[in-house]
Amino acid sequence: MKDIFIIGSRGLPAQYGGFETFVEKLISHKVSPAIRYHVACLSDESTGKHFDYKGADCFTVNPPKLGPARVIAYDMMAINYSLKLIKKEGIQAPIFYILGNTIGAFIVHFAKKIQSIGGILLVNPDGLEWKRAKWSKPVQSYLKYSEKEMTKYANLIISDNRGIETYIQNTYPWSRTTFIAYGTDLSKTTLTAEDTPVRDWYQKWE
């Protein structure tokens, strides 16, 4: 059995953006019975509550409310909880797949722990978050540094965009990278122009 711990999305079922939808589709299309997914889920209530979602072992994490820094605490707590679970259940050679660079400034500590138990650390860097104008200069500097640190300590950087992979390769030549595009649902929709979701969407954007 190969155990894969997914850290960094808000959890399941998907209710938000790209990472959450990616995780939902990933577990929904699992084929091999030899793979078991463990997914951290952000909670405002408790830490350590487990529930099954489409065969994935989901567990809640309730980080302290620290404003924008809450996501950093969330990822750190999720990794620590996963490490305890791995030890408790005797899981061998786990894979950690971290979505985003949020905890990059602290990743050396966690990378050493993961690799000391024979684990593998994979990272999806998302986009160029540090360039977004909504962040103050200190936050942009933190995110840029986090991005750099992730490339140093991850076993593999997985980009879902060719441009991001090229940027990582050119900026951090020591990094180990690969490109895996998101899949596309080619099945034809059964919705019509009269269905409520379609009408709501038109109304929202008219």
Regions found by a protein language model. Name each.
Residues 1-44, 89-91:
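N-terminal subdomain of nucleotide-sugar transferases
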Residues 163, 183:
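Carbohydrate-associated surface elements
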Residues 129-134, 188:
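A short acidic, helix-capping loop that chelates divalent metal ions and anchors anionic groups
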Residues 55-80, 133-139:
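A short, charged, and often flexible helix/loop element on the N-terminal side
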Residues 139-157:
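Membrane-proximal helix-turn-helix segments that form the acceptor-binding/catalytic region
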